[in-house]
């Protein structure tokens, strides 16, 4: 098993949102949003990165019955300079204007996400292969140059 790098102490907080909830929000904005308006989409699921990593480890350990999948895989690495400690999202506007809110609790969404990845190993193999990396680098290498 590969080590899992975690920046600094892993206490950077992010707002987590299940993919289907995000897609529904995009759909609602496309169908009913006002042109030129900005709608923040958030899940009201703020968690520290280290919590996410440990949750994934626990879920994979339980599903795969592999004692090699444990917190021992976590490797704390030097934090990025200026790394934000928290990304807070206020989705009040999209809720008030369009009636959108996240339907999937974090605990259910993370399990559904892990299950999807486990059921689609061929997709994972493809995107982690050298060929995909070469394609990605070729497609985006000059995009920042304007």
Q: Which residues make up each language-model segment?
A:
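C-terminal substrate-binding subdomain of Rossmann-fold SDR/epimerase-dehydratase oxidoreductases
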Residues: 1-146
């Amino acid at each position: 098993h590969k080590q899992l790098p975690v920046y600094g102490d892993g206490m950077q907080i992010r707002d987590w949102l299940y993919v289907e909830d995000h897609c529904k929000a995009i759909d609602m904005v496309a169908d009913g949003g006002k042109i030129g308006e900005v709608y923040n989409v958030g899940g009201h699921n703020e968690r520290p990165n280290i919590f996410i990593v440990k949750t994934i480890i626990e879920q994979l350990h339980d599903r795969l019955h592999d004692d090699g999948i444990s917190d021992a895989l976590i490797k704390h690495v030097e934090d990025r300079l200026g790394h934000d400690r928290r990304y807070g999202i206020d989705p009040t506007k999209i809720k008030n204007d369009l009636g959108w809110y996240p339907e999937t609790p974090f605990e259910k969404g993370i399990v559904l996400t892990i299950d999807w990845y486990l059921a689609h190993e061929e997709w994972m193999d493809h995107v982690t292969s050298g060929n995909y990396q070469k394609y990605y680098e070729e497609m985006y290498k000059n995009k920042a140059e304007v």
